[in-house]
Amino acid sequence: YIPNSLYNFHPGSHTGQGSDVGIDLTSTMISEVFKTVKNASTKLLSETMAGKGSEIGRTFEEVKQIIDLAEQKFGSSLKGRLGVCLDTCHIWDGGYDIVSNLDGVIEEFDKIIGLENLYAIHLNDSMNPLGAHKDRHEKIGKGHIGFETLYKVTRHPKLCNLPFILETPNEQSGYIEEIKMLKK
């Protein structure tokens, strides 16, 4: 346990039982975590997913359902304790067109989930075209999202103060180069 930290998780899969069952199970597990660790200051972040197979959290609406149901089951507000990590590869692969409509996607996120619930961003390019539902991360500027869009994400006034985490297929030296590119 590290006080005041962020703990990111993938919300899981419904394994053929349907999204509602998966969302219910995930929200139950979140509620149990908070019941067990009552006074922890660590924030639990549900990651946005690409929608491969039977993944849940593949739309902003599903992520919101997970949060709302967890709050309902916990019995009190989880505001400030439960939030979201937005993964650029996942939302692109899930069908959110951040290349052509970054502002629109951010507005949609805000309308459905609320930007006050966004605590971190996984910054990745994607090997796949928009809406492929595959979750294949690519190095910054080498995929279908492209450097220009990812740079805009890091400079966007509604996102620029969040922590950005690279999850690109790289060695240490590759991460150093990507960070240098993004800081220019």
Please state what every model-predicted region is.
Residues P3, E32, T36-K43, K79-G83, ...:
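A structural signal for the main folded, soluble domain(s) of proteins
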Residues Y1-G83:
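Active-site acidic/histidine proton-transfer and metal-coordination neighborhood
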Residues I56-F60, K64, W92-N161, P169:
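Gly/Pro-rich active-site loop or hairpin
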Residues V84, C89-G94:
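Short acidic, Gly/Ser-rich segments with clustered Asp/Glu that frequently serve as metal-coordination loops
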Residues P11-T15, T48-K52, T88-H90, D125-M127, ...:
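Active-site-proximal loop/turn and secondary-structure-junction residues that shape catalytic pockets
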Residues Y7, L44, D87, I121, ...:
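Conserved, mostly hydrophobic/aromatic
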